[in-house]
Regions:
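N-terminal active-site wall of soluble small-molecule enzyme domains
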Residues: 72, 77, 84-185, 191-196, ...
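Conserved, mostly hydrophobic/aromatic
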Residues: 31, 75, 100, 150, ...
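Catalytic cores of alpha/beta
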Residues: 142-153, 191-200, 241-260
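C-terminal helical cap(s) of enzyme catalytic domains, especially alpha/beta-barrels
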Residues: 224-228, 266-290
């Protein structure tokens, strides 16, 4: 039964070990404090959530949608961000999702964090209703109930940020995700986090080129880590992808997909912005490309 493992997750709420904490206070720290406080007050029974998931239709295959010989695009519905402020605060998620799909996106990412990104569950559901593409819930997962909520609101994949989670949490949340049919994009920023994600069993790795402390983007980060990602793992490049040249370089390094937000959501013609990024030949092997 779907909830057969639920009891084993009752004790998995774990504070992030100090060795995994960021060296200075960042926007991520503040967000995580808020999300963990919310999770600590959540009195819903996990068994009830597992039972509710059991009544849902199958998910759309997120990881499979990112595989292929040409570069895939995960286009993001993002109203604002802590680093850039308002991007497209009054967007219609259904319209944006359709624009992304017409441009050739293979999946849609939707921010659901409200306080910091002005996202919502309703944005995700509207996007899902508008297109047939897999939907990634982009939020700060700190409890297994966040994973179950993603499934219940209609997501096909969930984000796990390695910098925000302990090894036990990554493994536990991956197990819950797979139990309920979700794929998980495990986000890393360096080789140490990549090793942790792979050891936990991550099947989809996202390398984020944005520094969580300074917001600066290091466009060499993805290519320098590419050769460390096993060929059977789906590799996604995040942040700093602005044009066809960036996309081509990442495809040449062996990345299966790019996740893009600001550059497409603020474009005057979103479908064209997406189409400029798709279709680049993905290298047969992953290696650092300068």
């Amino acid at each position: 039964m779907l909830h057969s493992r639920a009891a084993s997750f009752e004790s998995t709420r774990v504070s992030v070990p100090h060795r995994y904490a960021l060296s200075v206070t960042t926007y991520l720290d503040d967000i995580l404090v808020a999300h963990r406080r919310r999770a600590a007050k959540d009195e819903r029974r996990r068994d009830d959530l597992f039972d509710a998931v059991g009544n849902l239709a199958p998910t759309r295959a997120f990881a499979d949608a990112l595989r292929g010989e040409s570069l895939r695009v995960i286009a993001e519905i993002k109203r604002k961000s802590p680093s850039k402020g308002e991007l497209s605060i009054d967007l219609d998620p259904q319209v944006v999702a359709q624009e992304y799909a017409s441009g050739g996106a293979s999946a849609i990412s939707v921010l659901t964090d409200e306080p910091h990104f002005s996202g919502s569950e309703e944005d995700l559901q509207a996007a899902r209703d508008a297109v047939d593409l897999p939907i990634l819930r982009k939020d700060f997962t700190v409890d297994e109930r966040d994973v179950l909520d993603a499934r219940l609101m209609g997501a096909d994949a969930v984000l796990l940020i390695a910098a925000a989670l302990s090894d036990l949490e990554i493994r536990s949340f991956l197990a819950v995700a797979h139990e309920v049919g979700l794929d998980a994009l495990v986000e890393v920023h360096d080789g140490g986090e990549l090793d942790r994600a792979l050891a936990a069993g991550a099947r989809v790795i996202g390398v984020n080129q944005r520094d969580l402390r300074t917001f600066e983007v290091d466009t060499d980060r993805c290519v320098s880590l590419a050769s460390l990602i096993p060929s059977e793992v789906v590799a996604v490049a995040e942040s700093g992808v602005r044009d066809a040249k960036d996309a081509e370089r990442l495809a040449a390094a062996g990345y299966n997909a790019v996740l893009v937000g600001e550059s497409v959501v603020t474009a005057s013609k979103r479908s064209s912005a997406v189409s400029a990024l798709v279709g680049h030949q993905v290298a047969a092997s992953r290696e650092a490309v300068r």
